[in-house]
Amino acid sequence: MAPHTEQLTRPAVRLRGLTRSFEGRTVLDGVDLDLPAGQFTALLGHSGSGKSTLLRAIAGIDHGVAGSGTLTAPGRVSVVFQDSRLLPWRRVLPNVLLGLDGEDAEERGRAALAEVGLGGRERAWPTELSGGEQQRAALARSLVREPELLLADEPFGALDALTRIKMRALLRRLWERHRPSVLLVTHDVDEAIVLADRVLVLEDGRIGLDLTVDRDGPHAHGGYRTRLLKALGVFEDAP
Ligand SMILES: Nc1ncnc2c1ncn2[C@@H]1O[C@H](COP(=O)(O)OP(=O)(O)OP(=O)(O)O)[C@@H](O)[C@H]1O
């Protein structure tokens, strides 16, 4: 069954009893979730727990997948994947502008590229960019659409450790500036804590843990890490 998606004037996600299954195997088993406007949320879970399935459902790109429940999402949604998905036969700026209307589109595209640190690379081909630069271009392509909701499916998963650190900082900076709601799917507990204000753990087809990260509160990074690892069944001090 197709998801019931209606456009809202305010950017927020609301899921009620969302189910999705593949070949009779239930992956999402009645997910209830609200994502308030402007919140940065990370989604953790074991491999195969259904994180991408949930993200694709919210993005409205899971046509043909069996399921039920209600889903409300904002009108302007951008999605970033692990690979940049830039069209190799188009230069960087046209990639960013793809499908964008308006007289000021080019100006906005250039500004977005400058914002992600790719000013001056507008005429480069995607293959001339490093992996990190390609992901920067993908972020520019997302942000130029001024999304109310940014869905990111392991956007830094294929990058080296140093580039990943820089890209995390960039994403947080862009979020602070533009304030879309963000749902970041990641395998990386530390990435989730460093970036997000709320961390969810998907478990047995539902949200098993819903943790608020209070940066100004008394809890240190390590405390959140231990709780999240425990929810994921990882006990670091076990032999
Ligand atoms: N199109 C599909 N057809 C059949 N099964 C699918 C399809 N998409 C996902 N699945 C199955 O649904 C389950 C959840 O997949 P999903 O990709 O959502 O998990 P995930 O938590 O994102 O995993 P990972 O962290 O490894 O990317 C998996 O068992 C997967 O094989």
State each model region's role:
Residues 59:
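Helix-to-loop junction immediately C-terminal to a conserved catalytic motif
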Residues 44-46:
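The feature captures the beta-strand-to-loop junction immediately N-terminal to the Walker
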Residues 144-148:
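A short, proline-enriched helix->beta-strand linker immediately N-terminal to the Walker B motif
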Residues 13, 28-30:
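Conserved structural motif at the start of ABC-family nucleotide-binding domains
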Residues 139:
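Hydrophobic anchor residue at the start of the ABC signature
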Residues 150-153:
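Catalytic Walker B motif of ABC-type/P-loop ATPase nucleotide-binding domains
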Residues 125-129, 133:
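Conserved ABC ATPase signature
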